[in-house]
Each structure stands twice: as C-alpha cells, then as structure tokens.
Regions:
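Bacterial N-terminal signal peptides
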Residues: 1-8
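N-terminal signal peptide c-region/cleavage motif recognized by signal peptidases
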Residues: 10-12
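Mid-to-C-terminal functional-domain signal that highlights helix-capping/loop sites
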Residues: 15-216
Length: 216
C-alpha cells in the first residue's frame, strides 16, 4: 500500500476550527464523561528528542502505524506506539509552538499551531471525554479544548480555535520512503511498555480498533 492510500491528509495550511455558538459550547461542557483517568495520569511530552530515519528504522517495523505532522522546517514522524501513551506532544520549532495530539478512543491524530496572543500554549490530556474524544487542557489558562477540532469550550479562551497543521496517517514503511529526511519522535526515557498498545492493535482483528462497541 502507498502513502496516498493509507494517509489521511488535512489540507489545512491556514484552516481554523469552526466557531460554535455559546449554547453549543455549553452543551459540550455538560456532556463530559468521567473515565476514571485523572488529570496528569497521561503525561504529555514537551520538546522531546527526535531520531533520524536510519536510527528509528532499527526499532520500527514497516507495517507499524505512524503519524506525520508537517511542521515548520519539514515533516516529523510520530509512532503510534509512543503517542498512545502520551497523547500530546508540545513542540517549538523556530519560536513557533505546536500541539501534536492523538486520541486513541476516536482514532484521531491532529496537529495545531498553539501560539495564541503572544503565548505558547502547552497542552495536556485532561482525562474526560466528549463523544469518546479526548478533552485537552492548556496549562496557561486552564481552558478545555476538543482534541478533534482544536476548539476551546470552557475557560478564559472559550470559543477560540487553533489553526490546524496538515497531518498524515500511514505506516512506517511508507513514511520513511516518502520523507527520508524527516525527524522521528524518539522513545522517551522511562519504563512504559511502548511496544504494547493498551487499547489493542490496528493490525489484529478483535481488538479495540476493530470493535464498534462504545467503550466510554
């Protein structure tokens, strides 16, 4: 399979999340689902290390799911095996801030320009869900955001939207052929079992990703 058949590309170089009415935003805030996951239990990453393609190739297999974000300066690759444990990567490239986000329960990978009003917003996973999608929280203002739209629905930044960054969903084999000079998110230090997905496996039948049942 080629990158074009596997990738979901957001043509959103200058796109921004569509505003909602205050009534719609209030409805979101009233329908959040408690998951038992507390704020801080899923640690986000801040300006993590990256490997070159040839170094990352030693630990990634060609059929593994990876995500690509087109940041300033070029493509960056984010292995799903790492993103599932952290869900948010806060990055700064040439003084430009980005939030690289992944929600395993909806299977959405989104990247945003997170510079706003002179601030570089830093995001974490808040722990609750809306319609199975992760709720994000920024450390700067404490506002709550939808992961799949980049829209603030509660807090001082209510109604604000983050510009989207183009992303791809593909495999490691396709990614390294198409972007041979990309930087690849390196395995963080720590004892998390990065080779194991707590939600299942995209390549194996009968796991979470092959199940239409509502989990939350």
């Amino acid at each position: 399979l080629t990158l074009l058949t596997l990738a979901a590309l957001w043509n959103a170089n200058n796109a921004q999340a569509r505003p909602r009415s205050l009534q719609e935003l209030a409805a979101i805030n009233g329908k959040l689902i408690e998951t038992g996951v507390k704020y801080g239990s899923i640690p986000s990453l801040y300006r993590p290390r990256y490997d070159r393609i040839q170094d990352a190739n030693l630990s990634l297999s060609d059929d593994e799911v990876v995500f690509i974000a087109m940041l300033q300066g070029g493509a960056r690759v984010y292995p799903q095996r790492i993103m599932v444990w952290h869900q948010v990567v806060n990055e700064i490239v040439d003084d430009k801030a980005y939030a690289i986000t992944y929600c395993p329960t909806t299977g959405t990978f989104m990247a945003y320009d997170s510079s706003m009003g002179g601030l570089n917003l830093i995001f974490d996973t808040e722990g609750r869900l809306y319609d199975a999608n992760s709720v994000l929280i920024d450390r700067n203002s404490g506002s709550l955001w939808l992961q799949e739209t980049g829209m603030a629905f509660d807090g001082p930044l209510l109604g604000r939207g983050l510009p989207m960054v183009p992303v791809y969903w593909t495999t490691w084999g396709a990614a390294k052929r198409t972007f041979p000079h990309a930087l690849v998110l390196a395995k963080p230090n720590g004892n998390k079992p990065y080779g194991r997905d707590p939600y299942g496996n995209y390549l194996r039948k009968g796991t979470y990703y092959d199940n239409d049942r509502l989990i939350y």
